[in-house]
Every structure is written in C-alpha cells, then in structure tokens.
Amino acid sequence: MTDANYDNQELKNAVCTQLNKNLVSFADAMQYLEDRGISQEIVNKAGIGFCPPYYNHYQNKQLILSPLMKGRITLPIRDAYGKIIAFAGRKFDQLEQNVELAFWNMYPNSPSEAQARIDQWKRGKWINESFPKKFHLFNLYLAKQMMREKNYVFLVEGYFDSLTLNSFGLMNNVALCGTRLTDWHAAKLSRYCHTAVALLDGDEAGRKALEHMAPTLEEVGMDLKIISLPEGYDPDTYLLKNGSKKILASIELMMRENVDEEIYEVCL
C-alpha cells in the first residue's frame, strides 16, 4: 500500500461519522442489524452506517462513492491502528440478500483524478476497486487488547460473523475479508497472541479453509484450535440461537494444561 492510501484521514472519518448518523433514519437497516444480533454499542464502536440510495454528498470532494454502495449498510475497513482504508457495503433487502460486497475506493490522488473519476461515473463507467485483502484483517483494531489479555484469537470468515462475536463479548476475533489466511496475516496475529481458534462455517468451504491455516500458523509459532459448528450454522447464527456459553466452555477445555496438541478440535 502507498502513502496515498492514508491521505485525507480526517475526511474519511467525517464520512464514516455521517454514514453512521444516517443509519438511525432507516428502520429496515436497523432491524437487519438487530436480527443479526449486532448490538447498538457495536454499531457505534465499529462505525457501521448506511448509504441511502440518493446519497452523493461527497461526490465532489476528491472522494468517489461508487453507485454500488448506495442502499447498503456500510462498514469501515480499518488497519491495525484504526485508520480507515476502505468501506464495504452490504445489501440487506430480501431480493438482493446475497449480493457480493462492493468496495468503495476513495483515494484519488489529486483534484484532476477525482474529476476524471466523476466524469467516468457520469458516463456509467464507475470504478469499483477493492483493497489488498492479504494485508488486512477486519476487526484487528478492536480485537488487539483482548487478544493480548486472552492469548488467543477467533478466526472467522465474514464481517458480520465478526460483528456478532463482538456483540456477544468475544471481541478477540478477526475476519479474513473473503480471502484465505496469508503469511502476513499469521505474522501479524502472532504479535498479539499464541493461539488461533478457527470458528468457521460448518460447510465444505469452511473445512477447506482449515487445510491451509495449520501450516501457515505453524510457520510463525502459533497453535491452531478448531471449534466445529453444527452443519448448517455459521458463527453468527449459532450465537443467536445458543449464545456463547458452549463456545467459551470449549475454549476452556482447549486451554487446559493437559491438552497440548498443536491442532485440537472440539465439536459443538
């Protein structure tokens, strides 16, 4: 990433604040978050917001909001130090529940580049660029303190899995932003704790993700523990139905002195 990615942090924070303020005016978006088990405290702490369908307030301020972000719940993506690097948007209406996350790239390096992007937008050729996911972990900024305290981190797949864990008090978690665990991810996590606890979806994709995790974590001296969810569950749906009691009991079992395997699995 270049230094340009960190320019205009004050403006990015202002956008995040405004999007967060927008949220309270849209009952459907608020209800969706409540149904996902995401508390108001976490909504505010994480800076979750909403981009209305008609929203273009920042179009002419060297900041380009992709039309794909409109009508979506917005999530600021932060680096380990809390700086905003991008936004993700999530459709929440029933007709488009499974639409892929769209990313808002907001780093035009000059007014002329900003104007060029606006012109592209007007011609229907907007830019929908992503950010380098292999160098970032969602929620790391909020998770660091508890990771140090507990000496372990939950690994989850999705942003909303992470946010739901936060709402249940399991703040020591990170989401992989739609990519597999990289060497950079593992090295970064090893700075804060010794053990990774994989809490992945109970499907084939979740199992495949585990195959790569163990050797990657082993390279940096981290242990891998696995909590297997029942079939058909992902972390947020499991927590909504069962709470965190069994998950915490599984962690206690894994951390006992007589359980010293580098890879250890508990089925819920």
Regions found by a protein language model. Name each.
Residues M1-I73, Y81, K144-R148, N258-L268:
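TOPRIM metal-binding catalytic domain and adjacent DNA-binding surface shared by DnaG-type primases
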Residues C51-C193, A209-L210:
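Phosphate-handling DNA/RNA-contact segment within nucleic-acid enzymes
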Residues V153-L155, C193-A205, I227-S228:
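Acidic beta-strand-to-loop metal/phosphate-binding motif
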Residues F160, R180, D203-A205, P230-D234:
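Conserved nucleotide-binding/hydrolysis micro-motifs of P-loop NTPases
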Residues N172-V174, A196, D223-K225:
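Hydrophobic anchor at the start of a short beta-strand
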Residues K188, T216-M222:
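Arginine/glycine-rich "motif VI" loop of SF2 helicases in the C-terminal RecA-like domain
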Residues A209-L217:
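Short, aromatic/basic amphipathic alpha-helical patches
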Residues K225-L268:
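C-terminal or mid-to-C-terminal helical accessory/interaction module adjacent to the motor/catalytic core
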